[in-house]
């Protein structure tokens, strides 16, 4: 009985955790959701961005004490400008979405919000990790062997 309870707790903890995509799985998913070439940004750049922002983890969060905002999900979308977490002072919520929706294993909402972010004048440069790790680099390795 004790072993059954422990097993149940382990399974419960597994179901609560976010999904960590495999590189090619993410590339195929992003392509299916229309990110390949969206606003001139290649699929390889999107996969590179997700690698360095979240490690392909849908459940990633990062609190920013300076402005009391939090970054959410696979693309680390910020609560100051793009989503509503009910905590960030002066939040804009330009994606008209709950920040928790960006933590789902189904990344359709995160992709829709990323499309909104990249549509702003800053484009993909809105993501610091992209500028640091992907910009002006050969990012083809991020989709290599994925058949996309």
Swiss-Prot record:
Catalytic activity: Hydrolysis of (1->4)-beta-linkages between N-acetylmuramic acid and N-acetyl-D-glucosamine residues in a peptidoglycan and between N-acetyl-D-glucosamine residues in chitodextrins
Active site per database record: 53, 71
Alphabetized UniProt keyword annotations: Antimicrobial, Bacteriolytic enzyme, Disulfide bond, Glycosidase, Hydrolase, Signal
Signal peptide bounds: 1-18
GO molecular function annotations of the record: lysozyme activity
Keyword Signal: yes
EC code: 3.2.1.17
Disulfide bond sites: 24-146, 48-134, 83-99, 95-113
Transmembrane segments: none
Domain C-type lysozyme: 19-148
GO BP term (any one): defense response to Gram-negative bacterium
Top-level taxon of origin: Eukaryota
Record SMART domains: LYZ1 (SM00263)
Note: Lysozyme C is capable of both hydrolysis and transglycosylation; it also shows a slight esterase activity. It acts rapidly on both peptide-substituted and unsubstituted peptidoglycan, and slowly on chitin oligosaccharides.
Role of this protein: Lysozymes have primarily a bacteriolytic function; those in tissues and body fluids are associated with the monocyte-macrophage system and enhance the activity of immunoagents.
Self-association and partners: Monomer.
Family indicated by similarity: Belongs to the glycosyl hydrolase 22 family.
Official protein name in the record: Lysozyme C
Organism the protein comes from: Colobus angolensis (Angolan colobus)
């Amino acid at each position: 009985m004790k072993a059954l309870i422990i097993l149940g707790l382990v399974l419960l903890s597994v179901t609560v955790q976010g999904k960590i995509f495999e590189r090619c799985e993410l590339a195929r998913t992003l392509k299916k959701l229309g990110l390949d070439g969206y606003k001139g940004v290649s699929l390889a750049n999107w996969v590179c961005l997700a690698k360095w922002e979240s490690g392909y983890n849908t459940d990633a969060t990062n609190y920013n004490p300076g402005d009391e905002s939090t970054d959410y999900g696979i693309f680390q979308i910020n609560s100051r400008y793009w989503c509503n977490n009910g905590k960030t002072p002066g939040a804009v919520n330009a994606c008209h979405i709950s920040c928790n929706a960006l933590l789902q294993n189904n990344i359709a909402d995160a992709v829709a919000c990323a499309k909104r972010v990249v549509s702003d004048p800053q484009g993909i440069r809105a993501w610091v990790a992209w500028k640091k790790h992907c910009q002006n680099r050969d990012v083809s390795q991020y989709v290599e062997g994925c058949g996309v």
